[in-house]
Amino acid sequence: MLVIVAGLNVFPIKSAGAVPVAEAELTTDGLRHDREYMLVRPDGRHLSQREVPELALLRPDYDGVKLVVHTPLAASPLVCEAVDGPPLDVTVHRRPCQGMDQGDEAAEWFSEVLRVPCRLVRFVGTRPTALGGGTLTYADGYPVSVLSEESLDDLNRRMDARLPMARFRPNIVLRGLGPYGEDSVTRLRGDHVDIELIRPCGRCVIINTDQDTARRSPEPLRALARYRTERFGGTREIMFGRLGVPRALGALRVGGELTAS
């Protein structure tokens, strides 16, 4: 089945705002520059919108050299260049990894803006995916997340709501599968691109956070729980979308076609 790439989103800083792009390079670790940075507490634990919803208000822009972060929480943006700072031992959901510290100026800016002591680190090394034999940067368990427009449309109909796709923070938005059609897709292929979809995407309280205001409500997690709770790997999770691992690398473009199988 042919499907359309309806949207592409890169998240330079884990748990911060998205950068919608018209084209993205698919690497072994996901979309180029996705989750390349992360904010960590003094003990190395990553910051997440689960505990700090204001992360949604950070608007990063990153070209591989210079990181610029705007936010309504600060009068002036942060502007800093990527540096090979001292390595720090950090964790993503208790899984150990490393990051290069990006200096005191960045740490002070983020700590003041978020009112949480933290430091900015840039990814270094390799991390294995939870399943599927891939690698990733600071994403939770898999380097690529996928969701279809039709699945969101169905959820909005059930809720009589108009939630935007931004609530669900997918890397790749698809059009043409039908509601929850991605559930049965195991492969997305295009010109020089091949993504294996490994498992459903388990959802948490982050999707209850308005990505424009950082305000949190009970929905849509409560609505999804009524009809999208499934068992995977011995645990029950609320599933919406799919997670995958790149198998062949190339460029993805909004408006481009992929073969879903």
Protein language model regions, located:
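Metal-cofactor-dependent catalytic cores
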Residues: M1-S261
